[in-house]
UniProtKB/Swiss-Prot annotation:
Residues 88-151 are annotated as: Repeat 2. The keyword ATP-binding applies. It is found in: Cytoplasm. Keywords: ATP-binding, Chaperone, Coiled coil, Cytoplasm, Nucleotide-binding, Repeat. Interacts with TagJ. One of its GO terms (cellular component) is cytoplasm. This is AAA+ ATPase ClpV1. ATP 1 binds at G237, E238, A239, G240, V241, G242, K243, T244.
Length: 902
């Protein structure tokens, strides 16, 4: 034994046996025994929940109680009183050696299981004698039966999936542990079992979700797989569109027998590329594993189709170091048709790694998996709804499925359908399930705020006790604490009321469901003894259900504390948390918003009613589905002098239509005055610097397909830049530098220009003789044609913006002063008032007509706000609180009255 390293020998024990010998060593020391004996080890193994030894004891008819008693007595017979362990006994070391010999040579394993230890001990006379000396029960073990039917004996032992503790897969050949030799060939079909997963078996056992809406792609797969040669489809598409789902759908069809006869007995196995690469430490080992997988597939009695997900990892630079030759191993088998493969990768990785190898490209037939339409995605969601209901124990309404698709498509543009809609619905289900039992987030947040305020007050009182001036801080903190406690009381009262209504609502639904002999929210069929309801009782329950839903809806408003079912509101609240867009704005009736759009816009844009009505009409036509669906929602050129509300129109539209001003894509066209800057907008072509990074415009629209595109000062751009928009205005699409088609169909495009402003100013010089917008637009055509090509003007609607009159300036002044009022009241908690004289004074100072409404902002920013700010800061420094602010006009100047708090 001295020639064999003990570390190497004991390293062959699997993790369970190794931990047991470690525990035996500790146990031996605690008992004061000098040597670690077999009895220590077997005692510790039998203390575990399960192992090979447990299974063998059960199968051999050994009495566990008698065995435990015998082992305890054997332990008591050992000498005691030692302060330290001298060594492992020779029996333990010899048992491991014999276990390794029989495990590696008889069973071809690279680990020592506790079952192999038992066989090694029973096959060695001296060890067998020592074992039966521990307990006569061990004499019942039959070594011949154990070796012949070892798999039957160990059954579902937890040691089945373990490996040697030293991390090496095999140790049969000298020098292999050091990596000096290539790994030996695996047994028949061993590579398949080790490196692949049987998808058809998973489909047969119900582990795969039903796949809906990918019939066309599955049919293409079948067409290609039925070829005699080059029968290898490769699925390409963006991450999350469902490439793997197509293959799972194919596996489900094979199991259902819904495939041609030639494919009915086929096994579909997924190759685990990560497992194939893991531990392939030396050159050639990865290729050897792949070759053995290919050989197993080709030699299998049952035809096998191999599914390779993330196929680019097998090709050249796409894989790990040393995997460059992997694709060359596949090529001959793929070309001859002896290895049928379904591959999947993203389009970008396909172009980067596979397309560059023509020999590999011709062996694969591309099947494009596009993002599904909203309609198809809803069908897919209906397919997974029942699975989610069973998992989360909640009820999902059909409106939630539609909301998950539509809201995710609109507000989560960075991901693809159906992946993002499934994630959204899953989160909404989890939130609904939690809300039925947990404390609502609003209540929990309120409690945390109260704790924080109480801590702050305790600190203030401690400071006050040592003479620090804290009266103002204490007053503010006590006010906030009282408000928060009042808010918490209201929340808890509403929570209790909602809980009562939800419990009754769920109980009523359960009764109706039971009466209909349906399946409850958990997916479990109800018993036979359920009470039947007559028609009158059923109608009464339906009426009560409608009444409860109405009460709950009225109580909850747009901020529910408990979600009884997964509905539109539940899904919208998740989107609100993910995107920051208020849930109420999305849940509000979109059609109502569109119908009243001009009224909403007129509150913010002053004096341009004709323009807002024209834009609103176009949006209403598009929303009704009567416009050309392949064009953008609308394309308008807003012409007028500076400061009349052109840019503000874009911001107001984004706020009303798309949920916030963050959905305005602003491109300053004055930056594109040279012809070569076209590539900045749509992305550099191949071979140019910046290729692959996307264009300023195309990337922004790809990320935010529902947005307002504002092309500011478009007259300053180079004529070549104007021409790239022809296709966008006509067909609603633009190709970027990489050839991807960017969809503009859900955008509203506004171009602003100062061209023709002199003509507009002269036509509108007399307010009494103000021409109609159509007349101004007709007059504007001539100056616009000097800058823009007729083809561009013909593709858009020109809307002139009137110069601002005194009445318009007064309305804008009131709007701006109203915003200041809100800021003062929110920041300083004091009232803010102003009289009409202030408005007249502001308008009288607007002498620069070419600046429009911007002059009002300049007057307020440079005059009124600095004076107010100085007074606020001075009073904060002196500790004099304010009770209110009033601004008036006196001697052609702003006059400020600051009321002091008592």
């Amino acid at each position: 034994m001295s020639e064999i390293s003990r570390v190497a020998l004991f390293g062959k024990l699997n993790s369970l046996a190794y931990k047991a010998i470690e525990a035996a060593t500790v146990f031996c020391k605690l008992r004061g025994n000098p040597y670690v004996e077999l009895v220590h080890w077997f005692h510790q193994i039998l203390q575990l929940p399960d192992s090979d030894l447990h299974q063998i004891v059960r199968q051999s008819g050994i009495d566990p109680a008698r065995l435990a008693k015998d082992l305890t007595e054997a332990l008591d017979r050992l000498p005691r009183g030692s302060t330290s362990i001298t060594d492992l006994s020779s029996h333990v070391e010899e048992a491991v050696e014999r276990g390794w010999v029989y495990g590696s040579l008889m069973f071809g394993e690279s680990q020592v299981r506790t079952g192999y230890l038992v066989i090694g001990i029973l096959k060695t006379p001296s060890l067998r004698h020592a074992l039966t000396g521990l307990s006569a029960e061990f004499a019942k073990l039959k070594v011949e039966a154990l070796t012949e039917r070892f798999d039957e004996y160990v059954g579902a032992s937890p040691e089945n999936g373990l490996s040697a503790s030293d991390g090496f897969n095999a140790g049969a050949a000298p020098g292999e542990a050091s990596g000096a030799l290539a790994p030996s060939a695996m047994g028949k079909q061993e590579a398949l079992k080790r490196f692949t997963v049987d998808l058809t078996e998973q489909a047969r056992s119900g582990k795969l979700d039903p796949i809906v809406g990918r019939d066309e792609e599955i049919r293409q797969l079948v067409d290609i797989l039925m070829r005699r040669r080059q029968n290898n489809p490769i699925l390409t598409g963006e991450a999350g569109v469902g490439k793997t789902a197509v293959v799972e759908g194919f596996a489900l069809r094979i199991v259902a027998g819904d495939v041609p006869p030639a494919l009915k007995d086929v096994e579909l196995r997924a190759l685990d590329v990560g497992l194939l690469q893991a531990g392939a430490s030396m050159k050639g080992e990865f290729e050897q594993r792949l070759r053995q997988v290919i050989e197993d597939v080709q030699s299998s009695e049952k035809p096998i189709i191999l599914f390779i997900d993330e196929a680019h990892t097998l090709v050249g630079a796409g894989g790990a170091a040393g995997t460059g030759d992997a694709a060359n191993l596949l090529k001959p088998a793929l070309a001859r048709g002896t290895l049928r493969t379904v591959a999947a990768t993203t389009w970008a990785e396909y172009k980067k790694h596979i397309e560059k190898d023509p020999a590999l490209t011709r062996r694969f037939q591309v099947v494009q998996v596009d993002e599904p339409s909203e309609h198809k995605a809803i069908l897919m969601m209906r397919g997974v709804a029942s699975t989610m209901e069973k998992h989360h124990q909640v009820q999902i309404l059909d409106e939630a499925l539609e909301a998950a698709v539509r809201l995710s498509h609109r507000y989560i543009p960075a991901r693809q359908l159906p992946d993002k809609s499934v994630s959204l619905l899953d989160t909404a289900c989890a939130r609904t399930a939690i809300s039925l039992h947990a404390v609502p987030a609003e209540v929990d947040d309120s409690r945390r705020r109260i704790e924080a305020l109480e801590t702050e007050l305790a600190i203030i009182r401690r400071e006050s006790a040592i003479g620090v001036a804290t009266a103002e801080r204490q007053r503010n903190a006590e006010t906030l604490l009282a408000e928060e406690r009042e808010r918490l009381a209201a929340l808890e009262q509403r929570w209790a009321e909602e809980k009562r209504l939800v419990d009754e609502l769920l109980e009523t639904r359960a009764r109706l469901r039971a009466a209909a002999e349906a399946v409850d929210a958990g997916g479990v069929p109800l018993g036979e003894g359920e009470v039947r309801l007559d028609e009158e009782q059923r109608q009464a329950l339906h009426a009560r259900l409608a009444e409860l839903q109405a009460q709950l809806s009225a109580l909850q408003g747009e901020e529910p504390l408990i979600l009884p079912t997964v509905d539109y509101q539940a899904v919208a609240s998740v989107v609100a948390d993910w995107t920051g867009i208020p849930v109420g704005r999305m849940a509000r009736n979109e059609i109502e918003t569109v119908l009243n759009l001009d009224r909403h816009l007129k509150k913010r844009i002053i004096g341009q009613d004709h323009a807002l009505e024209m834009i609103a009409k176009r949006i209403q036509t598009s929303r009704a589905g009567l416009d050309n669906p392949s064009k953008p929602i609308g394309v308008f050129m807003l012409a007028g002098t500076s400061g009349v509300g052109k840019t503000e129109t874009a911001l107001a539209l984004a706020e009303a239509m798309y949920g916030g001003e963050q959905n305005v894509i602003t491109i300053n066209m004055s930056e594109f005055q040279e012809a070569h800057t076209v590539s900045t907008l749509k992305g550099a072509p191949p071979g140019y610097i910046g290729y692959g990074e996307g264009g300023v415009l195309t990337e922004a629209v790809r990320r935010k397909p529902y947005s307002v595109v504002l092309l500011d000062e478009v007259e300053k751009a180079h004529p070549d830049v104007h021409e790239i928009f022809f296709q966008v205005f006509d067909k609603g699409v633009m190709e970027d530098g990489e050839g991807r088609v960017i969809d503009f169909k859900n955008t509203l495009i506004l171009l602003t220009t100062n061209a023709g402003t002199e003509m507009i100013a002269s036509l509108c010089a007399d307010p009494e003789l103000m021409p109609e917008p159509e007349a101004i637009a007709k007059s504007l055509r001539e100056p616009l044609l000097k800058i823009f090509p007729p083809a561009l003007l013909g593709r858009l609607v020109t809307i002139p913006y009137y110069p601002l009159s005194d009445d318009m300036l007064k309305a804008i002044s009131r709007l701006q002063l109203g915003r200041i009022k809100k800021r003062v009241e929110a920041t300083h908690k004091v009232p803010f008032e102003f009289d009409e004289g202030v408005v007249d004074l502001i308008v009288s100072r607007c002498t620069e007509t070419e600046s429009g409404g911007r002059m009002i902002d300049a007057i307020l920013t440079n005059t009124l706000l600095p004076d107010m700010s100085r007074e606020f800061l001075t009073r904060m420094l002196e500790g004099k609180p304010l009770a209110g602010v009033r601004i008036s006009s006196r001697d052609n100047q702003f006059h400020y009255d600051f009321a002091e708090a008592e």
